[in-house]
Amino acid sequence: MKKFINCGLGFITLLISCSSSPSPEGGGTGTPLPTTPAPQIIPLTETEAMDQVQKDAIKYFWDFAETNSKLARERYFTDQPSFESNIIATGGSGFGLMTLVVGIERGFIPRAEAVTRMTTALNFLKNADRFHGAWPHWIDGNTGRVIPFSAKDNGGDIVETAFLCQGLLAVREYFKSGNTSERGLATLADDLWKGVEWNWYTRGENAMYWHWSPNFGWDMNFKLQGYDEVLIAYVLGASSPTFPIPVAAYSQGWARSGAIVNGASQYGISVMVNHNGATGNVGPLFWAQYSYLGMDPRGLSDTYVNYGTLTQNHSKIINQYCIANPKQWRGYSDKCWGLTASYTRNIDGTTGYTAHQPLNDTGVITPTAALSSFPYTPVESMKFLLYLYNERRSDLIGIAGPYDAFSPHYNWITTRYLAIDQGTIAPMIENHRTGLIWKLFMQAPEVRIGLQSLGFKSTQYGF
């Protein structure tokens, strides 16, 4: 999948504390320094823990945004803060926009300053490289030009663009009735969304394709077929008032003319669909999150599947897998669970990247997996949240929230962050708490029209 990045990353040996201070110097007499007890972790209540992890995750997009564009950096290394500091993640920036809306609503960041920043960000996107309306996967924050994601991936990326457009629509809906500056921001978001040529990315077929390059055309040849993280591209394509895709692209492309359905089960829980490459099992948990930051799966069904049940089952299966722990990794439990794409520990101890899932379990837990599943598994996700903040806060929480990944088995922690992993935490926890981002996205008139055109029904929203 597109998210399976070979980062060629170096080996991390030390966990860096963001709050460390120099030790006092000895007096030169050889007398041992006094021992200072480690600070005691004050346990947080459930509400306090949800507040804190949302505040912490917001920092990635507020304190560590790309300096020129104010959009989301692809990654942030606590030991190399300037590493690839100009690379903007298009999809991660969409998640970041929704994260900032949560921050405003909860009073964690100042509203007026956030509006100014988002206006800067959207004006940057307005002038950045676009390819038939779609943005590339990576953008240079200094110039707005495309940074190739791979040799032939130097053009439009319709999936990353869809993730961004979820954020644009949430911003539009949140600010459309605000003051003059806010209404201007909403109009800018609307213009950007309406400029995407979704139908171009069908290449005239009854399916959508991930990439198009002005140099290599359709050479990447990646057809979007379910089930994975790309459902939102089809929904937004059908919802577009300017460049809509045909309904047949959804039914034949995403749904594979019904072949998306699968009757297998794991741990007595129905898998429901064919997870790409998982042969009767489930894929990484980001598949249950990226398309659903804005699109509310509760009570949402099409001809083939109930997406509320599907996403909940996916999260429950991953939880049960970690509890069963068939590979006998030390540390897996009902409070330490969660498999998704993230940084990982390679066999030789270096840091790499992989899509963790039951069929690709390397003993690495990724915090965003359980945290961003709060709407589906609130009890199980709360156990993990309290484990993070009440038991492991000193080594697993850093300057922008939970570190990207850790392995209890190998006593390994990466002190790195990724936009696409931090960016789902605050919105999905907020969807669990108040449904804020779901309500904003689902109230967009064109989204409802698009969903209905594809045969979707929603008991939650009455259509």
Report residues per predicted region:
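Bacterial Sec-dependent N-terminal signal peptides
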Residues: K3-F4, T13-P43
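Surface-exposed, charge/polar-rich loops and edge strands
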Residues: G10
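Generic structural signal for short, solvent-exposed loop/turn connectors between secondary structure elements
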Residues: K2-K3, E205
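Ser/Thr/Asn(+Pro)-rich, low-complexity disordered segments
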Residues: L33-F463
